[in-house]
């Protein structure tokens, strides 16, 4: 009985060591297979064969005057050129926006003079050109992107909730309404900023065009998963001036720099 227990204990304690020894070749084989696959792609590209013909990615974008998200579908035309189709949704802030809140009342933060939330929705096409690539190490691929398209500017009314003696105590007002004087005097009426669902019933749309240029740094070109950063400039022009802030000049033309983190998959 004792001999059986000793034998069983020896087997149990030796299992991790056996498992470790068996997993080492597996890990090594996987690395070797990946290295061989990358080398095969590099040799194929030297002969003009495209490693991945298309990709899809999602990005988080920070502009100098806002933020947003983007979606992209790309098609490789050659090892050096690709066509990109992009959809970007963002919120553009005015430089004079200042959030105010009071410690005396639990109201939502309020921006005095803000007239509208401004949401540009851009749909466009870009051309991508390979600028540099450390292909022998599956390193960083550097590419330049140039393009543009249409932009639809959505204006959501900025509704402010204030104290009002003519209603049940509190009332939502906006500048483009008969209550414009109360909107202007909101600071003296215990104001509260709008919630996420306020102002959509007074949505307005302004069409426009945009142009964009950028440089993209794609890490691991021969990996199926895309992991990249992009920096660039973009300009937008709308068919009429965009009212964003009270007592400030309205603009038709917007120019900004941006930084984006992008993730996706190649096929």
Label the predicted regions.
Residues 1-49, 267:
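Cleavable N-terminal export/targeting peptides
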Residues 38, 45-53, 99-109, 187-196, ...:
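Flexible, solvent-exposed coil segments and beta strand-coil junctions
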Residues 60, 69-75, 123-129, 148-152, ...:
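Residues on the lipid-exposed face of transmembrane beta-strands in outer-membrane beta-barrel proteins
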Residues 52-56, 63-67, 81-83, 117-121, ...:
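Residues that define the transmembrane beta-barrel architecture of outer-membrane proteins
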